[in-house]
């Protein structure tokens, strides 16, 4: 059974999509079978994996959640390349899922049940969650074994974290123990700038841990602000493949390529730390 990990923060602009896709690529390159699920109507993860989103798509997460579509009918290949990792795309229609789900019985368990037939095909299923606490995000949390909370390096990064912790504790306390084993795997700081502002955010998070007993710990790996992360997303790919695309025929190009490889290396380090935290300490095989 694949380990299901949601990248979750009810705030936007914290690097959820970038972290989900690049972590998936890092794990895939280590030899793990990976499925990404884009649970955000903005569809940034889907776009990074080469999908053009429109309302005419009929095999997406929206149909899984609201129309009873089987998960394996909505699985695509990253960049449509053989041997790449898989994904289930989002759709603009996913915005309608909140109202559609509100009247459905067992609405919070739809994704969990839909993934059961395919989970044995993957080592990891990574979910890119929307910046909201609605039914779609609840489905992601109920389907997950672990949560990773990306936080940007701004001083107020932990504002609103209390709502995530509250929802997490509510799920853990549900009758019939529907997902009592859910864990917060950790908090990863992204978009880190050189000015050191993230130290304030780290201190604030440490205070909340001590004062309120928040679960989870901060990942040692930090994702530095890097122009290549924005550029790779704009070119609808991950930073690993983007770095490979860049020419190295002169000093400027070689320097740019090296900059992009630094970002890729940070996500590789994050993937390794994830493996350690979930008890899978060594890559099973390298695709390189």
Predicted region positions:
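P-loop NTP-binding core
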Residues: 1-288
């Amino acid at each position: 059974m694949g380990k299901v990990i949601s990248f979750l923060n009810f705030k936007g602009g914290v690097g959820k999509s970038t972290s989900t896709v690049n972590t998936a690529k890092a794990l895939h390159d280590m030899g793990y079978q990976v499925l990404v699920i884009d649970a955000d109507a903005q569809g940034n993860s889907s776009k990074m994996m080469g999908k053009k989103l429109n309302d005419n798509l009929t095999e997406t997460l929206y149909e899984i959640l609201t129309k009873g579509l089987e998960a394996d009918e909505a699985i695509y290949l990253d960049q449509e390349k053989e041997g790449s990792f898989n994904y289930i795309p989002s759709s603009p229609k996913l915005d309608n899922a909140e109202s559609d789900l509100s009247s459905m019985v067992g609405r919070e368990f739809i994704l969990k049940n839909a993934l059961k037939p395919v989970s044995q095909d993957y080592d990891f299923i990574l979910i890119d969650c929307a910046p909201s606490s609605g039914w779609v995000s609840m489905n992601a949390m109920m389907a997950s074994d672990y949560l990773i909370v990306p936080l940007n390096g701004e001083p107020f990064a932990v504002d609103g974290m209390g709502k995530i912790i509250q929802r997490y504790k509510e799920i853990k306390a549900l009758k019939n123990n529907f997902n009592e084993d859910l864990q917060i795997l950790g908090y990863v700081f992204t978009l880190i700038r050189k000015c050191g502002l993230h130290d304030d955010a780290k201190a604030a998070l440490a205070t909340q841990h001590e004062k309120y007993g928040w679960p989870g710990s901060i990942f040692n790996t930090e994702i530095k602000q890097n122009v290549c992360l924005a550029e790779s997303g704009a070119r609808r790919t991950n930073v690993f493949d983007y770095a490979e695309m860049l020419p190295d025929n002169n000093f400027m190009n070689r320097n740019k390529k090296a900059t992009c490889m630094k970002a890729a290396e940070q996500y590789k380090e994050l993937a390794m730390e994830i493996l350690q935290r979930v008890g899978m300490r060594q890559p099973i095989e390298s695709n390189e």
